[in-house]
Each structure stands twice: as C-alpha cells, then as structure tokens.
C-alpha cells in the first residue's frame, strides 16, 4: 500500500501529541516532515519519529520549506491558532491539502 506523506506544522503540546498518539500509529501514514519555529521542538519531534521505527523526517523552522521538493502530500497545522489561516492558505495555494487540528481557527 502506498503511504500518505504528512507534514506536521506546530510541535507544541497539540502537534507533538497528535504525532505521537495518532499519526505514528496509523497504517498508510508516514510523517515525512516536521516544522516549528522553535528548533528544539523540531528536533524532539524528529527524534520521536525516528525512535518509532520510521525514517527521520525533514526538519524545518519555516513552514514554507515543506512545500519544496515534493516532501509532503498534505500537512496538518497544529501551530498557534493565530497562524492557522496564513499557513493553511499558503499550502492550499500550492495545491497541498491541509488539515487543521482546530476547525475554524
């Protein structure tokens, strides 16, 4: 089965928890990129993915980097609520599907 390549943007409590408890345990999903403005959160999430017997994901502190190089099939936005619209619109304009962990944020 082909895997859906997911990028996670925002790796605070919500984004890290979604990655750890949901995305790393779903068949057909591979976390291929992690992003947060805080480098320590990016490294922590990348370590988590790798410890879960998945390839180490691409790491970024600028969400725009996830749209380059065919890295993701979709992104999950779990960043600060004030950033959801900006980030979501950017990816939608690139033709990349978006999921927001908070609807209408």
What name fits each language-model region?
Residues 67-69, 74, 80-81, 85-105:
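Beta-strand-loop-alpha-helix segment that lines the small-molecule cofactor/substrate pocket
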Residues 56-62:
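Conserved SAM-binding strand-loop segment of SAM-dependent methyltransferases
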Residues 19-20, 63, 88:
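Generic hydrophobic/aromatic pocket-lining and core-packing "Φ" positions
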Residues 54-55, 96:
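Short glycine/serine/threonine/alanine-rich loop segments
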Residues 32, 57, 73:
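Conserved acidic residues
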Residues 1-52:
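N-terminal Rossmann-like dinucleotide-binding module
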Residues 15, 59, 84:
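Conserved donor sugar-nucleotide recognition element shared by glycan-biosynthetic enzymes
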């Amino acid at each position: 089965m082909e895997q859906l390549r997911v990028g996670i943007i925002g790796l605070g409590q919500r984004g890290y928890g979604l990655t750890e408890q949901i995305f790393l345990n779903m068949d057909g999903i591979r976390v291929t990129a992690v992003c947060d403005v805080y480098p320590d959160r990016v490294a922590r999430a990348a370590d988590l993915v790798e410890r879960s017997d998945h390839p180490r994901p691409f790491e970024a502190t600028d969400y725009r980097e996830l749209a380059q190089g065919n890295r993701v099939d979709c992104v999950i936005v779990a960043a600060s609520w004030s950033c959801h619209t900006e980030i979501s619109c950017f990816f939608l304009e690139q033709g990349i599907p978006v999921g927001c962990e908070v609807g209408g944020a």
